[in-house]
């Protein structure tokens, strides 16, 4: 972010705690390009309204966002160890939602990570599993709106796109949520921008 800001003279937006945590690693940023967005707030940027909300993760002031434009909205919620009421309240009206589907629990348990990292990933301030992502989508779908859901932040070590998708589909099928009719489900590519 620091390199982009310096090269293209663009601002960096972050809440105060996140800014303080990353300030040294960014390098020198022009004062006018330092933009503090208070936690749990809404700000307008041109014709976009951007709302931040807390996400339970073991990083400094982890945050998700909902962006509204001309009556439409999109949300991003990653780095969430637990799907909370605050997250649901902030994303349930969005037409497009990028939601974390980070790992398969068994792959974490039997994978190469050291014990402490496994415990961290699986904790309530770690990352959302594929099954918990499916359960979160069930909660989102209780709000009667056709949505596009993008599964994102898939672990390279503890997940496989097909496994993430199938785990979520299994949960949705168990709750009689019809993919294609009730919602569109996509996977974000790990290494390139989505065409969604």
Residue map of PLM features:
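Short active-site oxyanion
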Residues: 7-12, 73-74, 183-184
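Short, charged, surface-exposed secondary-structure boundary motifs
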Residues: 22-25, 45-47, 62-63, 107-110
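Core dinuclear metal-dependent hydrolase active-site scaffold
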Residues: 38-96, 196
């Amino acid at each position: 972010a620091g390199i982009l800001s310096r090269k293209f003279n663009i601002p960096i937006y972050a809440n105060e705690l996140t800014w303080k945590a990353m300030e040294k690693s960014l390098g020198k940023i022009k004062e006018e390009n330092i933009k503090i967005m208070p936690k749990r707030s809404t700000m307008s940027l041109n014709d976009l309204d951007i709302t931040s909300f807390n996400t339970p993760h073991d990083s400094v002031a982890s945050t998700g966002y909902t962006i509204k434009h001309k009556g439409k909205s999109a949300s991003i919620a990653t780095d969430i160890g637990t799907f909370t009421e605050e997250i649901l309240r902030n994303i349930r009206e969005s037409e497009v939602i990028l939601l974390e589907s980070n790992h398969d629990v068994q792959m974490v348990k039997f994978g190469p990570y050291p014990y402490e990292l496994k415990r961290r990933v699986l904790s309530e301030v770690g990352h959302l599993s594929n099954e918990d992502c499916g359960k979160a989508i069930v909660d989102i779908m209780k709000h009667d709106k056709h949505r596009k859901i993008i599964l994102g932040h898939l672990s390279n070590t503890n997940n496989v796109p097909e496994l993430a998708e199938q785990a979520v589909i299994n949960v949705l099928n168990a709750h009689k949520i019809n993919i294609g009719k009730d919602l569109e489900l996509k996977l974000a590519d790990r290494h390139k921008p989505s065409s969604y």
